[in-house]
């Protein structure tokens, strides 16, 4: 209005308003986070929220080595107290504290998840902003075990389009997890998280009187690998052929190694496979185990029984 008075409205050209319209939808990153929430809640987990400020004593509670990178935490200049004096470098303490609170209140079969940031300094003292990384943290005790947690992780990976088979490296080296029940989650050659049973000593420190299980997934890596593109194929007019196969092998051979062989040998005919039994007992030689799979093959052109049996 002031410009019209100064310049005279007759000297101002008539134009149409311009602007950019955007589609009202979630960003790709938020879509991946939404899938994480949906999968966790579908599997019976409730969302929790914990503080980003913690005590440096947390690192001792988690039995971290003195030179562990997670001890390199950012100090708060004006903390409310020692309990909130550093920015967290792992979301695990908040999850274990929440599980302990529920256990002490006699809540049974607790399943919790959290989507929250951790803060990893590039150098100390700070010379630039830290690396903020979102972690998808799952924790539970009561009904369920290591394989229940593994199933949740696999379901999440499938829903965000990670179609390659993830593997589990048992040499995770996490002091806060049970030495024989932990694994790094590896996808496409990258470690994208870890999971396992909480170390009994750590569970005792936090006051959790049952076996507890956790999984921590690095969301930036998952977002980079995820895709929501889907391809569909018609239904094969030839019936699928299923075979049950049982194999005796040394205990040192991992199930993931067996499944890698199945995928490589199955070729184009392989539709699905499922582990349905692992047996160790008197009928099996010491140091060996029996592993049984159900394997389904299908073809869109032809499929003969001897072709299925050949591999």
Language-model regions: role of each:
Residues 32-36, 91, 95, 111, ...:
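General structural feature for long, well-ordered alpha-helical segments within catalytic domains
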Residues 118-120:
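Short beta-strand micro-motifs enriched in acidic
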Residues 7, 12-13, 50, 122-126, ...:
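A carboxyl-terminal module marker
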Residues 114, 307:
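Acidic-residue sensor for enzyme active/binding pockets
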Residues 37, 77, 96, 100, ...:
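Generic hydrophobic alpha-helical scaffold/packing signal
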Residues 1-3, 7-108, 296-298, 304, ...:
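Extended, well-folded interaction surfaces typified by the phenylalanyl-tRNA synthetase beta subunit core
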């Amino acid at each position: 209005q002031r410009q019209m008075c100064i310049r005279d409205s007759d000297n101002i050209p008539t134009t149409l308003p311009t602007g950019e319209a955007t589609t009202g939808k979630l960003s790709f990153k938020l879509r991946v986070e939404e899938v994480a929430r949906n999968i966790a809640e579908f599997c019976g987990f409730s969302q929790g929220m914990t503080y980003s400020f913690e005590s440096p004593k947390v690192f001792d509670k988690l039995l971290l080595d003195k030179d562990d990178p997670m001890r390199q935490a950012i100090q708060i200049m004006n903390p409310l107290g020692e309990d909130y004096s550093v920015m967290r470098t792992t979301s695990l303490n908040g999850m274990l504290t929440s599980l302990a609170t529920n256990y002490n209140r006699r809540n049974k079969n607790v399943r919790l998840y959290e989507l929250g940031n951790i803060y990893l300094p590039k150098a100390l003292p700070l010379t630039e902003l830290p690396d903020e990384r979102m972690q998808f943290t799952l924790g539970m005790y009561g009904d369920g075990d290591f394989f229940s947690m593994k199933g949740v992780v696999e379901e999440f990976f499938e829903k965000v389009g990670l179609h390659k088979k993830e593997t589990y490296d048992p040499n995770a080296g996490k002091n806060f997890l049970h030495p024989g029940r932990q694994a790094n989650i590896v996808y496409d050659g990258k470690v994208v998280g870890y999971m396992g049973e909480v170390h009994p000593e750590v569970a005792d420190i936090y006051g959790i009187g049952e076996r507890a299980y956790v999984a921590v997934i690095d969301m930036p890596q998952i977002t980079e690998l995820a895709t929501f593109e889907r391809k569909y194929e018609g239904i094969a007019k030839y019936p699928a052929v299923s075979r049950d196969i049982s194999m005796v092998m040394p205990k040192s051979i991992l199930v993931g190694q067996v499944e890698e062989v199945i995928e490589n040998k199955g070729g184009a005919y392989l539709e699905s496979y499922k582990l349905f039994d692992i047996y160790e007992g008197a009928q099996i030689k010491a140091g060996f185990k029996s592993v049984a799979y159900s394997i389904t093959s299908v073809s869109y052109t032809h499929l003969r029984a001897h072709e299925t049996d050949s591999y």
